[in-house]
A protein has these predicted regions:
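PLP-dependent enzyme catalytic core of the Aspartate aminotransferase-like
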Residues: 125, 248, 262-307
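Helix N-cap motif at beta-to-alpha junctions
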Residues: 235-239, 278-280
Length: 307
């Protein structure tokens, strides 16, 4: 039965997570159910309980490596528990967006994860996962090469839809990528150059946050080994006002709450920091403004609470 014909259809959304994932499933009429994250990935106790008890839950979003925005790498146990899920809905699917599969900032700390396709096959769930990746953050944003991996049965199904959407891929672009990279070693060498650009930016943000906020007990943030983001938590109720104050001083952030379904962070505390685009001078200034904004907003909240 097509999902569009299922009343009260639902989709699991690990959060903090990727706002565009949430927007896609919301656009298609899914009810979005947040799933808390921990240091190993989504809380699998919650995932297992939900999918085993509700056949209107049709899927879950996952970014298994350097997850956006927390930079978490799913543990082997988490991945194996995903592969061994026993969903009540027989058409339940894991949307495994491996967007940052080669995006390490520290090459010597590269973390390999189990292949979800193989794990699902071994667990007797070969059709349960779609895995995606692209070169959008490797070569050309929005115009690189993309790929999907799944079971033979799923790929036949996907091709059946794709043939009506497009005559075929851009084969010249495919050839361009193959000739440039040649093999996985070529991709890794290229990504090491990306890492050399990004690493100083991430380290500059982390240093300033430590200099300005460490030990105050008013914030915590991640120091990822890869990916594109730093996840920052204020005290409860301070994120929106912090982003607003930063905006008034010329520093723009993704809206507070964007990392949660419907843009609703129930604690109003998570902010996604993206140090990748700006130059080093602007990054340092913006981070100092951000840290100052966190202090001001937090102090105002604490004063008002004490009054």
């Amino acid at each position: 039965k097509p999902w569009c014909q299922v009343e009260d259809r639902k989709f699991l959304c690990p959060a903090p997570g990727y706002d565009r994932h949430f927007a896609i499933t919301e656009h298609f009429g899914m009810k979005l159910i947040p799933v808390p994250m921990n240091e190993n990935g989504p809380d699998m106790d919650v995932v297992e309980e939900l999918v085993s008890s509700d056949d209107t839950i049709k899927g879950i979003w996952c970014v298994p490596k350097y997850e956006n925005p927390m930079g978490i790498v799913f543990s082997d146990e988490t991945i194996q528990r995903f592969a061994n899920l026993k969903p009540l809905a027989k058409d339940f699917r894991i949307f495994w967006d491996n967007a940052y599969c080669v995006h390490s900032i520290y090459q010597n700390e590269e973390t390999d994860i189990p292949d979800i396709i193989s794990e699902c096959e071994k667990a007797g769930n070969p059709d349960m996962v779609y895995e995606f990746c692209s070169t959008s953050k490797i070569t050309f944003p929005g115009s690189g090469i993309s790929a999907v991996a799944s079971s033979p049965a799923n790929l036949i199904d996907i091709k059946g839809f794709l043939k009506y959407a497009t005559i075929g891929p851009d084969k010249i672009n495919q050839l361009r990528h193959v000739r440039y990279f040649k093999n996985i070693a070529g991709i890794k060498a290229h990504m090491a150059k990306h890492a050399d650009i990004l690493r100083p930016k991430f380290e500059a943000v982390d240093k300033i946050l430590n200099d300005e906020l460490n030990g105050l007990g008013i914030a915590e943030w991640t120091k990822p080994n890869g990916g594109y983001f730093i996840s920052f938590n204020t005290l409860k109720g301070c994120a929106s006002d912090t982003v607003t104050l930063c905006s008034k001083m010329g520093v723009a952030f993704t809206p507070a709450g964007a990392t949660y379904p419907y843009g609703n962070d129930p604690e109003d505390q998570n902010i996604r920091i993206a140090p990748t685009f700006a130059n080093m001078k602007d990054i340092k200034l913006a981070t100092k403004i951000f840290a100052l904004s966190v202090k001001i907003v937090t102090l105002e909240k604490l004063i008002n609470k004490a009054a």
